[in-house]
């Protein structure tokens, strides 16, 4: 990964691959790239992980463009392979929505579809060899005059807690919105304060239900992040091994990891559907 003859240790190699390309505002008011994790921490809230943002937006755009173009060409006569694939995915999503969502809301199925496909695409970046995109980013950085040791690129968006928390917070906002819309502000407040032990235990009920409510987005985010971060770490550790050992370990792990990529997207999507169903239920 180095553009010089400097020896790269295992520790520095791992740290380099686990650090995001961070741009933000330093305490002195200036905006620039972080060269170390400590500099990234100094930025506080105003720190943007450009690698996570760029990869996630590019994959999201590819998803929308692909589905739009295939949708425009859909036909009932001789469907293409792409059309058959999309129809299969949509049928799969609809089956899950019908099985878990017992109310009527035309937004839930598109939300589930977008969530599933987008997370699958972001998770799939974990199957790209760990040095490819960081190397490209380093070469671009050198071309722009940057020190290659200070050019980072973490290519799996879902291995960044900011991405998974961002998605789960979006889902959390929808849960709150539909809970109030379907049950009314009073009904939603009663759900948080009068259950599970009745009105006499209102403070205790509020504590339990509040924790349960907040745990939904937190568990959504951390489950996805933890699994993808662990998978990325294993690929990085395999990359530290001799070349002949890498292929004997990386291929079986990559094949197994395909299951993790799909399973984590499916779990996230399923929980989104379940949480949306709970938000629409009139009774707790």
Swiss-Prot record:
Q: Which GO terms describe its cellular component?
A: plasma membrane; proton-transporting ATP synthase complex
**Species for this entry:** Ruthia magnifica subsp. Calyptogena magnifica
Q: Which InterPro entries does its entry note?
A: ATP_syn_F0_a_bact/chloroplast, ATP_synth_F0_asu, ATP_synth_F0_asu_AS, F0_ATP_A_sf
Mark the transmembrane ranges: 47-67, 108-128, 156-176, 233-253, 254-274
Q: What does this protein do?
A: Key component of the proton channel; it plays a direct role in the translocation of protons across the membrane.
| Recorded superkingdom | Bacteria
Could you tell me the membrane topology recorded for this protein? Multi-pass membrane protein
- Subunit composition and interactions: F-type ATPases have 2 components, CF(1) - the catalytic core - and CF(0) - the membrane proton channel. CF(1) has five subunits: alpha(3), beta(3), gamma(1), delta(1), epsilon(1). CF(0) has three main subunits: a(1), b(2) and c(9-12). The alpha and beta chains form an alternating ring which encloses part of the gamma chain. CF(1) is attached to CF(0) by a central stalk formed by the gamma and epsilon chains, while a peripheral stalk is formed by the delta and b chains.
Q: What NCBIfam families does the entry give?
A: ATP_synt_6_or_A, PRK05815.1-1
Query: In the record, what terms sit under GO molecular function?
Result: proton-transporting ATP synthase activity, rotational mechanism
Q: What is this protein called?
A: ATP synthase subunit a
Per UniProt, the keywords (alphabetical) are:
ATP synthesis, Cell inner membrane, Cell membrane, CF(0), Hydrogen ion transport, Ion transport, Membrane, Transmembrane, Transmembrane helix, Transport
Q: Where in the cell is it found?
A: Cell inner membrane
* Chief localization: membrane
The protein's matches in Pfam families, at most eight in alphabetical order, are given as: ATP-synt_A
Family that this chain belongs to: Belongs to the ATPase A chain family.
Biological process annotations from GO: proton motive force-driven plasma membrane ATP synthesis
């Amino acid at each position: 990964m180095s553009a010089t003859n400097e020896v790269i240790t295992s520790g520095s190699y791992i740290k380099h691959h686990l650090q995001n390309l961070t741009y933000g505002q330093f305490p002195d008011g200036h905006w620039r790239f972080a060269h170390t994790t400590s500099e990234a921490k100094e930025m506080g809230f105003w720190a943007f992980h450009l690698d996570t943002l760029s990869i996630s937006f590019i994959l999201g755009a590819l998803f929308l463009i692909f589905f739009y173009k295939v949708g425009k060409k859909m036909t009932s006569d001789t469907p293409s392979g792409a059309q058959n694939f999309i129809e299969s995915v949509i049928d799969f999503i609809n089956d899950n929505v019908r099985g878990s969502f017992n109310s009527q809301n035309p937004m839930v199925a598109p939300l589930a579809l977008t969530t599933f496909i987008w997370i699958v695409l972001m998770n799939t970046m974990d199957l790209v060899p760990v040095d490819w995109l960081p190397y490209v980013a380093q070469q671009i950085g050198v071309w722009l005059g940057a020190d290659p040791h200070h050019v980072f690129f973490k290519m799996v968006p879902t291995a960044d807690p900011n991405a998974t928390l961002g998605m789960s917070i979006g889902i959390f906002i929808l849960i709150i919105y539909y809970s109030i819309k379907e049950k009314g502000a009073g009904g939603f407040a009663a759900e948080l304060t009068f259950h599970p032990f009745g009105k006499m235990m209102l403070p205790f009920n509020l504590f339990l239900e509040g924790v349960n409510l907040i745990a939904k987005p937190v568990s959504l985010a951390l489950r996805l992040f933890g699994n993808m971060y662990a998978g990325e770490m294993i690929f990085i550790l395999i990359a530290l091994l001799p070349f002949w050992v890498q292929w004997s370990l990386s291929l079986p792990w990559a094949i197994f990891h395909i299951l993790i990529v799909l399973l984590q997207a499916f779990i996230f999507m399923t929980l989104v559907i379940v949480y949306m169903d709970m938000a629409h239920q009139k009774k707790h």
